[in-house]
């Protein structure tokens, strides 16, 4: 299954002295490209995720810390930090989509309730017309 999460930029900060690698990912969920974009409002997720922009962009950071007894390997540290940052990014994106889904389901339920009410009113009015035409 394909997701719409795209990492537009990756930055690393390596601290050899403390054996730490920090990875920063610039993430784009590409909301404007989604088929439901015309129905999506930032209000659906802004309260829970204020750091996500209107278009679905956000930044995540993660670090990899080497054990003091182990030998520091920058390449492995970068891979671990990037992987941890991606876990955060996909977690945030999934929870953002969950907020959007809940909001849209609530709207669909309200639309369905209104539809049922209109259908009932139509039946009542049809019966009223029949009675008036007798």
What positions do the PLM features span?
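Catalytic phosphate/metal-binding cores of nucleic-acid and nucleotide-processing enzymes, i.e., regions
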Residues: 1-134
């Amino acid at each position: 299954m394909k997701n719409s999460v795209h990492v537009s930029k990756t930055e690393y900060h390596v601290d050899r002295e403390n054996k730490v690698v920090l990875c920063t990912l610039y993430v784009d969920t590409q909301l404007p490209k989604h088929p439901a974009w015309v129905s999506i409002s930032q209000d659906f997720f802004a309260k829970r995720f204020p750091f996500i922009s209107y278009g679905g962009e956000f930044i995540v950071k993660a670090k990899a810390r080497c054990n003091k007894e182990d030998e520091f390997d920058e390449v492995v540290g970068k891979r671990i930090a990037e992987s941890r940052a991606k876990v955060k990014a996909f977690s945030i994106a999934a929870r953002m989509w969950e907020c959007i889904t809940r909001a849209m389901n609530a709207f669909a339920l309200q639309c369905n309730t209104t539809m049922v009410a209109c259908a009932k009113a139509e039946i009542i009015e049809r019966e009223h017309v029949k009675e008036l035409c007798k």
